[in-house]
């Protein structure tokens, strides 16, 4: 068991001179992130996160910079790393570093650098005080703490997790009895999963393919592997661009949804020979396997918008066909398999952040408002929670949504008292039971 700290490094970014450029974009994003700005106004004076030392591991983007500065405004000390080797926007990282917040992130990390950056966030300041809160995306920070620095777990009041993959890891730990602190599953808040995962991907999936390849998407045959919330948004993204979209699914309910939404649902092997683009969205492993690559036609584009790169057999590609690899431009690589060229984007990692700038600010405000509320709840009310995985209560989910309505001109109809009594709710909400599926 480790008892060491790590040497103090104030920050490490690609180029601190990019800070002014980053600051201008952060200010622009703030106007599109009304939820976070409302929390600053509501809680800025009371500082509910005072004393919290939050280590964050989440894509270091412009939108994340607004989240970080919101946590600081609410009283927290924050350190930050990125949860993906390609997702950092270097001007965003520079702006945060220039603001005096320790950040360790740059685009194009090696795996060794990736782990080093996460490790730097575990201890705060020159006196090396350990973290006491975790804000994670994918579970890499949580795993490092629990597997390599388990002695730190006792001092951690709680953690919040952003994405499907990380939530799966938390539930596995809970089942095994190895989760030593309470956790809030932010991913499955309605205002996260039905907005970030669906509407975010609906905008960013096509954006990434266009920026990376400049291909015409209208008329192209696109295979979307998976029809969960991410798959739904991704399929709609390509459909809106005029692509001919086919979905693959293991779940009969999701498969039926895809069919009723107007998509063909087929097995991957059936549609691969004619596919122009294949994109994985499942959060599972081994979706595009060696035999699938061998069945693809010349110039097929392959990408992933799930959290990790193991949805696609990237290791096999590099082991068996690495000698044919040609970098067309950063995060766009060509492999030759049986005389056919295959185009792999972002090395099989998150394509919307590797090849573009991720989701728009407005939809990320939904997710990050959830994250902020989760951190406040765990920090202030730790004793009310067991070492289990929890959801944010529905009244907070509704609050997140309400904070974003004015920005897009939404007018809510007000429920009358007798109407509220008729359906068994209060005038103020929550308006739906816990079992309601949006």
From Swiss-Prot:
Positions bound to NAD(+): 163-165, 197, 226-231, 249, 284, 305-307, 352
Q: Which family does it belong to?
A: Belongs to the adenosylhomocysteinase family.
Which GO terms of type biological process are on file?
L-homocysteine biosynthetic process; one-carbon metabolic process; S-adenosylmethionine cycle
Can you name the source organism?
Christiangramia forsetii (strain DSM 17595 / CGMCC 1.15422 / KT0803)
Gene expressing this chain: ahcY
Establish whether keyword Transmembrane helix is in the entry: no
Instruction: Enumerate the NCBIfam families for this protein.
Output: ahcY, PRK05476.2-3
Pathway listed: Amino-acid biosynthesis; L-homocysteine biosynthesis; L-homocysteine from S-adenosyl-L-homocysteine: step 1/1
Q: Which cofactor does it need?
A: NAD(+)
One GO molecular-function entry = adenosylhomocysteinase activity
Q: How is the cofactor bound?
A: Binds 1 NAD(+) per subunit.
Q: Which UniProt keywords apply?
A: Cytoplasm, Hydrolase, NAD, One-carbon metabolism
Instruction: Report the domain of life of the source organism.
Output: Bacteria
Q: Output the Gene Ontology cellular-component terms.
A: cytosol
- Protein name from the UniProt record: Adenosylhomocysteinase
Phosphoprotein among keywords: no
**Known catalysed reaction(s)?**
S-adenosyl-L-homocysteine + H2O = L-homocysteine + adenosine
Q: So where does substrate get bound?
A: 61, 137, 162, 192, 196
EC no. given is: 3.13.2.1
């Amino acid at each position: 068991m480790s008892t060491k700290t790590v040497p103090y490094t104030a920050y490490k970014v690609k180029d601190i001179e990019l800070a002014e450029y980053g600051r201008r974009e952060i200010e622009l994003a703030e106007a599109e992130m009304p939820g976070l700005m409302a929390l600053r106004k509501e809680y800025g004076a009371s500082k509910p996160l005072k004393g919290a030392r939050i280590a964050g591991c989440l894509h270091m983007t412009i939108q994340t910079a607004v989240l970080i500065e919101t946590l600081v405004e609410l009283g927290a000390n924050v350190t930050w790393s990125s949860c993906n080797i390609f997702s950092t926007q270097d001007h965003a990282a520079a702006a945060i570093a220039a603001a005096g917040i320790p950040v360790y992130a740059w685009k194009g990390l090696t795996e060794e650098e990736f782990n080093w950056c996460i490790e730097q966030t575990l201890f705060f300041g020159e006196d090396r005080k350990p973290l006491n809160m975790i804000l994670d995306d994918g579970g890499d920070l949580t795993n490092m703490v629990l597997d390599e620095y388990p002695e730190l777990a006792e001092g951690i009041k709680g953690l919040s997790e952003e994405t499907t993959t990380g939530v799966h890891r938390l539930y596995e730990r809970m089942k095994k009895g190895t989760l030593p602190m309470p956790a809030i599953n932010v991913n499955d808040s309605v205002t996260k999963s039905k907005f970030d995962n669906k509407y975010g991907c609906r905008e960013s999936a096509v954006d990434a393919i266009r920026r990376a390849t400049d291909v015409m998407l209208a008329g192209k045959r696109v295979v979307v592997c998976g029809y969960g919330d991410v798959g739904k948004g991704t399929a709609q993204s390509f459909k809106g661009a005029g692509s001919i979209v086919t979905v693959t699914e293991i779940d009969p309910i999701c498969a039926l949804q895809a069919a009723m939404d107007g998509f063909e649902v087929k097995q991957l092997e059936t549609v691969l020979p004619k596919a122009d683009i294949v994109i994985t969205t499942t959060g599972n492993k081994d979706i595009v396997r060696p035999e699938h690559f061998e069945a693809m036609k010349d110039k097929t584009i392959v990408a992933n918008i799930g959290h990790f790169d193991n949805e696609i057999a990237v290791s096999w590609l590099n082991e068996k066909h690495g000698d044919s690899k040609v970098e067309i431009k950063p995060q766009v690589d060509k492999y030759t398999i049986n005389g056919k060229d295959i185009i792999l984007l972002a090395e099989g990692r998150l394509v919307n952040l590797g090849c573009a700038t991720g989701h728009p600010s407005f939809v990320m405000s939904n997710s990050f408002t959830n994250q902020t509320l989760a951190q406040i709840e765990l920090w202030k009310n730790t004793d009310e929670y067991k070492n289990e995985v929890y959801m944010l209560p529905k009244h907070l989910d509704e609050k997140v949504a309400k904070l974003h309505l004015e920005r897009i001109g939404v007018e809510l109809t007000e429920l009358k008292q007798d109407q509220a009594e008729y359906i068994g709710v209060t005038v103020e909400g929550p308006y739906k039971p816990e079992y309601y599926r949006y």
